[in-house]
């Protein structure tokens, strides 16, 4: 935003469109791996972070495509809002420019592979991949001669700030969960939500409407630690894939960065936008992009393959469908085990049974001990 917003305003872009596209582009990072929201949701849903990242690939591409189609529509039907750059402002495509672009892209691609590639290939856990990402980022900063002790302290301070906040929220959420479970609150929630008409789709529609309005007042950490653990068992009982459920909630919760009263993306944009840009323009410019994010939520609800297509297709075994058959003994019918059966009982006690086999001993008489 610091770089692109002044340039767009300089060449006559509509302020609402310019601020909206910057704010919406920033919120995509909540869905595109490596997203912190996906990591937290994977932990709360008991699913692999790698699977959650794979499931988010499809919706990420869909969201970018929806945004691009909207901009293309405006450039065709409302060209005054997105005017073309004058010829003198356009750079010429030459070998030097290509090499410069590649020189800036390759280190970033390597850093992305250190984090995401190692997770997808099973070479590292998310914690180990995060450590590799830190080492790679510090190496890039050192290569550009920007690695200073002040920068390291700033990074450590930000990390401790976020970690402390998450830990305290987790402690409070755990206390709430213990009390809630002790009062059988989960049974009440399950009974209430399982009766929603429409089956799994009706449940997802209700939950996403609920999460959308809840995000007006709560941060995604509070929603993930308090609300999601109550909804996950119900979703699983309805046969909803928890990866699909988690990615869907992640897409929904990114809207909280675009609408009041918090709208962190809008506040950050207000802090960097020039005074000529009105606050009302920033809020009004976010409305179309917020609508497109909700359209993506609807697409993922009715098209779960956009998430599950990228996942491993290994079938899951439902323990409730396993049937165990115990073979019958002797000639009792059914599947019998060979050479396994009770001794014949057609003889009187103390007498030989049929087929020359010994009968059952007479237990009414005292045992006889032969000297």
Residue map of PLM features:
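Alpha-helical transmembrane segments of multi-pass membrane transport proteins
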Residues: 1-371
